[in-house]
Every structure is written in structure tokens, then in C-alpha cells.
Amino acid sequence: MKKSNYKEELIDKIKMLAQSNGLNTVFTTFLEITATSIAAQMDPQNAEEREQRYQEIAAKMTPETLSSYARMFALLTLATREHIEDPCDILGDVYHQLRLNNEWNGQFFTPDHICRLMAQMINVDMPPDKEGPITISEPTCGSGTMVIGAAWAMQRKGIDYRRKSFFVAQDIDIRCVWMAYIQLSLYGIPAVVIHGNTLTMETWSHWYTPCAAVPFMEESVEKGA
């Protein structure tokens, strides 16, 4: 089936909005407002804080600008849905196509095919006697591409990563944290994405994807019953 142009439409939308605000500002704002909107609805541990931050960002925008960011989120959601059986790093590709690496201290994210190869070399298998999920750590997650590659490899092995895995991803750059959090959320990957310094062990915030937040939701419901 022919793929649509959702990713290209997203890039065009970012460029259009960037005419008056700059590419880096628009892309960074898109990441933050999207990440906080997801977390405000789906992460009960941090919902109040995320909702407050979302409202602070939205209050500074015109209705037209806010609508543009909502459309960008919709386009990203549609793009990830097309790849739900073949997960890939959409935001990382958008970042590179926008040539933002010069403004992000020269950061480059590992291409999908390399991440998939590395994930296959790790050869993740579900032990027959293991009841809990496979836990995988990614200490420098970037846009989440290695986690997405691992999910892809698990899926090819017939392992349901939505039910049989849990990822702990971390990055020192909050923009990378948002990128990873958004994509892992949209792909239904259970994970906590940590804004922190892997070397010094400092942590500043935790972002639980909707699939990871479900146990906390169930616990809240049980307490309220």
C-alpha cells in the first residue's frame, strides 16, 4: 500500500510557522507542547504539573498558532499509525531534514537501519520461564531511535513489545527527552523517559508513556473504589 505524505506535510507545516519564529523555536515548542499535552492526559503521576506547563505555553499563542501546533501533532500521529507495524524514528528524520543539528550542538541520531541491525545483534528473546516484562535500558536515548529499533526487532520475533517489554530511556537534553517520549507514546511502547545525566546520576524529570502509566491508573482507580 502506498504511503501518504504525512511526514512531509509536518515538515512543511513547521517551515511555514518558522517564517516568523525560526525553525529551532518552532520545532522545540512543538516538542514541548506535544509532550506535555500527552502527559497531562495519560500520566497521572505528573498530570497536574504537565497540564500547568501546557496552559502556560498555550496562553502565549494566538488561536491560529495553537491550531497549527495541533495540526502538526495530528500529522505526526497519522504518520506513526502508518508505521505501527514497522516502527521507525519519524521525529529524528524530521529533525535531520530540517537541518537542526547545527543549533543542537551538532547532534546526529543513529539511522533506523543501523538501530535495527544493532537490535537484532543483541538478539532479545523472551525466556520461557519469565512472567514479567523484558527490561531494557538506553542511557543516551536521543530521539528514541534505539528503543524504537528494539521494539521493531521484538515485533519481528513475535514478541508483543506492548505487553512484554519495559524500557528505561534517558537523555541529558530535554528536547531529546520530549522527542523520545512522544514517539514511544504514539507507538504504544511501555517506557519511562528520564531527563537526567547518566554519568552523574542526576535526574530532573520522569515522563511515563501511556502504556507504562496504566498500572498507576489502575492503582488510582482501586484506591478510589
Enumerate the language-model features and the residues they cover.
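Conserved S-adenosyl-L-methionine
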Residues: 112-212
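SAM/dcSAM-binding transferase cores
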Residues: 205-225
